[in-house]
Amino acid sequence: MASGKATGKTDAPAPVIKLGGPRPPKVGSSGNASWFQAIKAKKLNSPQPKFEGSGVPDNENLKTSQQHGYWRRQARFKPGKGGRKPVPDAWYFYYTGTGPAADLNWGDSQDGIVWVAAKGADVKSRSNQGTRDPDKFDQYPLRFSDGGPDGNFRWDFIPLNRGRSGRSTAASSAASSRPPSREGSRGRRSGSEDDLIARAAKIIQDQQKKGSRITKAKADEMAHRRYCKRTIPPGYKVDQVFGPRTKGKEGNFGDDKMNEEGIKDGRVTAMLNLVPSSHACLFGSRVTPKLQPDGLHLKFEFTTVVPRDDPQFDNYVKICDQCVDGVGTRPKDDEPKPKSRSSSRPATRTSSPAPRQQRLKKEKRPKKQDDEVDKALTSDEERNNAQLEFDDEPKVINWGDSALGENEL
């Protein structure tokens, strides 16, 4: 017997509750976008991607038999002098039976389509994963456990735990075009390109350039909120926010250089990669409460393990050696260099060098203004380009498994 409360019910779907923050970028028609971020060619007319492993992005929610699909080429353009100009292609992943090529079976030949499958995948089956509605869901960050695309491609770094208020460009570090497997990552760090600290410093600079300006009032609020929720604003020293650095007790992290530079020190961002999130700290720590005269004291003991085969293992060890109980010290490469003997001697009438002839300054010619800039892109092209960065000469950064995680800069 039907209940009287059922009166007025309909079969209409429940309204979608959208998360806060700005809308994510749209790709193609609404509701038909890839679940994953794109890989981007480094140069125009690059060949189609080849993968070290299966080429299927990591997705722990799917069984092995469902891990198959295709990468589809997406042409890109940007406005420029004299009209729109092509930029290197982007490639998006879709599961078999979904997306723009949903009518194709796995392996069917078509221009701009590259089929991929994990070992043990049932390529005769069709996926029920569907596609992404950009108004409701963010792109999922790309990760390849068995090896990514070849060196002709790259992708922008997106932290795994980012919120909807942070777009992919919030931590855009031009992330690795080939994240190494654990076997291949051992002992391969070399050159300034692989320096974790330098790259972390670059991320901070990029964030400050692209991010919104922090007002003095906002900076003051960041530095003086409840102690456990404070963050260091740009231009602040560490001890201005968290008190003087000490040895052997709480507040023992940071040498004099880090204290002076605050978040400008790239080592800060590097170490934030190892700091637990709020949830990890609460549910993964040994929590010890203790009543004291001034209130309830909560102690959180958490251990982060950096595997020895992590590509940045040596850098993390180096930072810890410098910064744990580091008050009163500075990195060796930051110590002031002694003046040379010739420059330290006072100049005399006989030994003073002859004055240098000053070069005539060249007159700066005014730059020619662009007379014609065609910004007319079609609506589809604007949607396709909305999420993409146009880096003329992107630097490949190999973060591997130790990519910068969630931070609160």
From Swiss-Prot:
Q: Which GO terms describe its molecular function?
A: RNA binding
Residue span of region Dimerization: 226-333
Name the InterPro entries on file: N_prot_C_CoV (IPR044344), N_prot_N_CoV (IPR044345), NCAP_gCoV (IPR042547), Nucleocap_CoV (IPR001218), Nucleocapsid_C (IPR037179), Nucleocapsid_N (IPR037195)
As for PTM, the annotation reads:
ADP-ribosylated. The ADP-ribosylation is retained in the virion during infection.
Quick one: where is this thing mainly located?
virion
UniProt-recorded name of the protein:
Nucleoprotein
The Basic residues compositionally biased stretches are: 358-367
Q: Where is the composition biased (Low complexity)?
A: 162-179, 341-356
Q: Which cysteines are joined by disulfide bonds?
A: 320-323
Provide the CoV N CTD domain boundaries: 215-331
Q: Would you say which domain of life the source belongs to?
A: Viruses
Q: Where in the cell is it found?
A: Virion; Host endoplasmic reticulum-Golgi intermediate compartment; Host Golgi apparatus
Instruction: Enumerate the UniProt keywords alphabetically.
Output: ADP-ribosylation, Disulfide bond, Host Golgi apparatus, Phosphoprotein, Ribonucleoprotein, RNA-binding, Transcription, Transcription regulation, Viral nucleoprotein, Virion
Composition bias type Basic and acidic residues, residue spans: 180-192, 247-259, 368-384
CDD domains named among the record's database cross-references: CoV_N-CTD, CoV_N-NTD
Q: Name one GO cellular component term.
A: host cell endoplasmic reticulum-Golgi intermediate compartment
State the species of origin.
Avian infectious bronchitis virus (strain SAIB20) (IBV)
**Residue stretches in coiled coil:** none
| Annotated spans, Disordered | 1-32, 44-69, 121-194, 238-259, 326-409
TM stretches of this protein: none
Function, in words: Packages the positive strand viral genome RNA into a helical ribonucleocapsid (RNP) and plays a fundamental role during virion assembly through its interactions with the viral genome and membrane protein M. Plays an important role in enhancing the efficiency of subgenomic viral RNA transcription as well as viral replication.
Q: Which gene encodes it?
A: N
Keyword Transcription regulation assigned: yes
Q: According to the UniProt entry, which residues carry Phosphothreonine?
A: 378
